[in-house]
């Protein structure tokens, strides 16, 4: 559904047996052949170093996904990079994008521009750092994580980097929620049209 992330989700939609509700039809995938990549998601955000921040865009949107995420905003929120020891910076710098940064923790990779992100987690080995940025040797900002989850830039996360990581990692991606919500709306519309038809007979 356009979320630039490889993540499996288990979604339950339930109705009462005696409600005469139409069968729920799960929405068909929209981006199976042309998925959004990390570049599509965050390629327009300012390239900042570890411990740095930025509150203004420096370029125009490059992809349709970025255009949707910005929605004509000029101010940028939650784009503060976690600070790392120099040893960590060098570890990220020496890692090829798409490859794990640590042999022991192979789920901690440096993201690649041309692929979707793996699953964004709320927890992890360290509170500030799960994936490395594809180009800059640091972990992701809350805004970059939010983009990868398909949160628009006008959604502002409160708290620090750790709280932002928990909020983004635990969330259902808005684009997924919108697709499922649209299917629920169709099901309910069909149901109430039938109810109204029966009442008018």
Protein language model regions, located:
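C-terminal target-recognition/interaction regions appended to catalytic cores
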Residues: 59-201
């Amino acid at each position: 559904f356009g979320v630039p992330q490889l993540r499996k989700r288990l979604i339950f939609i339930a109705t009462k047996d005696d409600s005469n509700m139409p069968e729920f039809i799960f929405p068909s995938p929209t981006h199976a052949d042309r998925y959004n990549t990390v570049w599509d998601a965050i390629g327009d955000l300012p390239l900042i170093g570890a411990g740095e921040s930025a509150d203004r865009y420096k370029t125009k949107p490059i992809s349709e996904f970025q255009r949707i995420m910005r929605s004509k905003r000029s101010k940028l929120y939650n784009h503060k990079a976690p600070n790392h020891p120099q040893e960590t910076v060098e570890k990220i710098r020496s890692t090829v994008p798409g490859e794990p940064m640590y042999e022991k923790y192979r789920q901690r990779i440096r993201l690649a521009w041309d692929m979707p992100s793996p699953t964004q987690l709320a927890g992890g080995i360290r509170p500030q750092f799960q994936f490395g940025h594809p180009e800059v040797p640091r972990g992701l900002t809350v805004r970059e994580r939010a983009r990868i989850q398909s949160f628009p830039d006008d959604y502002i996360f409160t708290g620090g980097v750790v709280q932002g990581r928990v909020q983004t990692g635990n969330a259902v991606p808005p684009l997924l929620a919108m697709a499922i919500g649209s299917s629920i709306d169709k099901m309910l519309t069909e149901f109430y049209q039938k109810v109204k038809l029966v009442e008018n007979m």
